[in-house]
Amino acid sequence: MAYIKVGIISEPSKMLTIPNIFDLPSIGAGHDGYVFHFNGKAIKYLKYTPKIRGEKGLMTLEKFETLKDVKTKRIIMPEDAFYTEDDEFAAYTMPFVHDYSKEIGALNISPGDFYYGDFLDAILDLEQDFEELNKAGVVAREINRGSFLYDLEFLKMCDIDKYQIGVKRPNELNRNMLNFIIAKVIYYQILEEGANKEKLKALNNWIKKTCQSSNFVPNLKKKLEKEPTRLISEGINTLSKTL
């Protein structure tokens, strides 16, 4: 059993409870928690004790309280906290994003099915999102392939549990991470279309180079602006070559 509750702890009659979270429809699981459907939202049930989560740099109540107040468009932030019977922070809800890139058959939508204009919109939103992270003293961390979701609006980012809070000078770190995210969109799409060992090595070197480049995103935006109706799949290989 995994009983959790949400609401005002001092007023038990007003608490919403989930007797066993593992009875909910599963969305997925990772090294730090389990994700389920709940009332039109996604709810993440956290692994480990609060102390161990803090030691591992995972989600803590302090981090939750910081991130839930950061207003973003593309980065999925937590909304409500759930607690155990002993009033320990144990789970949180967040907006549910339907990831069409993981669908099979007719419902599948690949990132390559979107347009340069969609990619540009995502970049502009992410730039604003990262400005909000900077203001809050938060640095994005531990971005991997599972962090990328693709709904009908193109790119969304999840897995904020290892984001770092209380950073005094986050701007440069976040710029590098924003570069990394945008470069990885291109990288993963090229991999999807096929890449031999030589090409893979070149792509990895390109990723390392772009992460610390101040010109990468401005140059990419200019290229995307010129051909907003071009399919990403049609021009993906030129994006890494010309930037």
Regions from the PLM with identified roles:
Residues 7, 20-83, 110-116:
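ATP-binding glycine-rich loop module of kinase domains
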